[in-house]
Amino acid sequence: MRRVYLGQPPICHNVAVNNEEHSELVDTIRHWAAELGFQDVGFTGIELEEHEAYLQKWLDAGYQGTMDWMGRHGTKRSRPSELVPGTCTVISCRMDYQPEAQDAWQVMSASKKGFVSRYAVGRDYHKIIRSRLAKLADRIRQELGSGEFRAFVDSAPVLERAVAEQSGLGWIAKNTMLINESAGSYFFLGEIYTDIPLPHSNPKQEKHCGSCSACLTACPTDAFVAPFVLDARRCISYLTIEHEGSIAEDLRAKMGNRIYGCDDCQLVCPWNKFATISTEPDFAPRWDLDNPNLVELFSWTEDQFSERLQGSPIRRIGYEKWLRNIAVALGNAETSPEILQALKSRENHASSLVREHVSWALSQHN
């Protein structure tokens, strides 16, 4: 956190200032953000009561699975001024990430290949965006000569999609993703909380999903309980990234060759015809992760996993879950001597979690 004030944070009255000076500053901030690689910026206040009620209902239903951290911070997630006292404005920034990569559907139709969610085939976005947000906050502070700023990138209790929707960057769609009508949904979000009152962006957009339900029916594991409601416990992204233990057997075959994340509900969304290829070199595929060979990935040692995925968001799931996920994909692959040999090489792995999923995978080839 970059602080200017010492002692108690300054009091900021929760009002949007619309004087000419601050309006010019907003335009300047947009210009600076564009120079730093952001495609859009929105400004909003801290009133998120509607989203707070929705979040609590979702948590009460248990849809978060083992993600206990979703409810760990009480109302700080939906009340920015409780998380960072003095906050009265949230600056929401969008950075597009769609890489120039192998066609996703082609990869998923090739059972001996592994599918990695397109946001994760390049470098970890957290450090990239956090650094850019810090630079943006510094420029604002230098311009004003005062103020307090704190940047967040998917690593703190922040309702980032709610904030982005409220700031006019898009609408939360039936697949619970944020969609921008001119850019689709292949983008990252980052926020700057500040005690500087700034004019708010245009009111949040209406939802433009209409009668379309492509995302709901495309989900391989039927994770959508209803439009706008996701049961994370059935979501492949949750199962391959957040879930620590054994993957439910009734979901394994449905996972296909998706070894890290899932993009199906975005791939079928009509709005993503407007998504453009990112110009960020760091989001370009590394180690052929846009079209990897499952057997090759499964052969990696733990040292190779750590070395080759250094700087990748995949690394944080750890080697054990990496092997678990690939074992499931190998179980769903077309039978071949190569597949069987790879699985048998891990039959006696030190991890009971890996052994369990290898055993299941081998049973699929009998």
Identify the role of each PLM range.
Residues 14-208, 256:
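Auxiliary alpha/beta "docking" domains used to position bulky ligands
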Residues 38, 214-238, 244, 258-282, ...:
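Iron-sulfur cluster-binding cysteine motifs and their immediate structural context
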Residues 249-283, 307, 311-315, 321, ...:
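C-terminal amphipathic alpha-helical segment
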Residues 306-308, 335-347, 366:
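Amphipathic alpha-helical scaffolding segments comprising HEAT/armadillo-like alpha-solenoid repeats
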Residues 315-317, 345-353:
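Short coil turns that connect the paired helices of HEAT/ARM alpha-solenoid repeats
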Residues 322, 353-355:
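Positions within the helices of HEAT/ARM-like alpha-solenoid repeats
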Residues 326, 358-359:
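Conserved hydrophobic register position within alpha-solenoid helical repeats
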